[in-house]
UniProtKB/Swiss-Prot annotation:
Encoding gene per record: pyrF
Species of origin: Listeria monocytogenes serotype 4a (strain HCC23)
EC number(s) stated in the UniProt entry for this protein: 4.1.1.23
Quaternary data: Homodimer.
GO biological processes: 'de novo' pyrimidine nucleobase biosynthetic process; 'de novo' UMP biosynthetic process
Keywords, ordered alphabetically: Decarboxylase, Lyase, Pyrimidine biosynthesis
Protein name (record): Orotidine 5'-phosphate decarboxylase
Pathway given in the UniProt record: Pyrimidine metabolism; UMP biosynthesis via de novo pathway; UMP from orotate: step 2/2
Record's function text: Catalyzes the decarboxylation of orotidine 5'-monophosphate (OMP) to uridine 5'-monophosphate (UMP).
Length: 233
């Protein structure tokens, strides 16, 4: 059964601990983002790993190639399962990131590495006016996806709305990791390109990241099980 990735959008380990305790020791897939990592440092990864959870470390690195390479050497040593960069950093940067992960992993298992295409909070209008990208949103996402594949990365972060086109372009094994997932009863909040877990499954996502629909639910375990059911029907 494919597990959804739970976005641990908290500031403190105490909040994380209280949340994870609700799942009675079940091994989960979780995302540690900027808020949690920058507030607590690398120790937060170690503490969560001790509970046998898989970790997607979502720091979206974007810098010159050598800096990203050096950073990835360090991140690989944390023992996380997946990391990411911004595809906008370019092919050379992504290749350097991959090289850094391989160096940092040594003889151990290398974390998967994926690249962010366009954020799910980005609309086509804002992309065109603020980023001065004059293509369609889909064309931009496909361009970044092809670049990511050429650099040898495992896949991309994308909206589920682009997942099938990315699959057709890059093959079924190329990961399409999809945030912006909400249960039908939940508000979209600051996300724009959102879908339900069921729709994400039907239109080509390989992995889904779910935050507020689970973490802010009155009963997080029940919400998680609902997401799990929709994602695996």
């Amino acid at each position: 059964m494919n597990k959804p990735i739970i976005a641990l959008d908290f500031q403190t380990y105490e909040e994380v601990e209280q949340f994870l305790a609700k799942f009675s020791g079940e091994a989960l897939s979780v995302k540690v983002g900027m808020e949690l990592f920058y507030s607590n440092g690398p120790i937060i990864v170690e503490k969560i790993k001790q509970q046998n959870h898989e970790i997607f470390l979502d720091l979206k690195l974007h810098d010159i190639p050598n800096t990203v390479k050096s950073a990835m050497v360090g991140l690989a040593k944390l023992g996380v399962d997946m990391v990411n960069v911004h595809a906008a950093g370019g092919k050379n940067m992504m290749e350097a990131a991959l090289e850094g992960l391989e160096i940092g992993s040594g003889s151990g298992k290398r974390p998967k590495i994926i690249a962010v295409t366009q954020l799910t909070s980005t609309s086509e209008a804002s992309m065109q006016s603020e980023q001065l990208i004059k293509t369609s949103l889909l064309e931009s996402v496909l361009h970044y996806s092809a670049l990511t594949n050429q650099a040898g990365l495992n896949g991309v972060v994308c909206s589920a709305l682009e997942a099938e086109a990315i699959k057709q372009q890059n093959g079924a094994d190329f990961l399409r990791v999809t945030p912006g997932i909400r249960l039908a009863s939940d508000a979209a909040d600051d996300q724009i390109r959102v879908v339900t877990p069921e729709k994400a499954r039907l239109i080509g996502s390989t992995d889904i990241v779910v935050g507020r629909s689970i973490t802010r639910a009155n009963d997080p375990v029940a919400a998680y099980n609902q997401v799990l059911k929709e994602w695996n029907v």
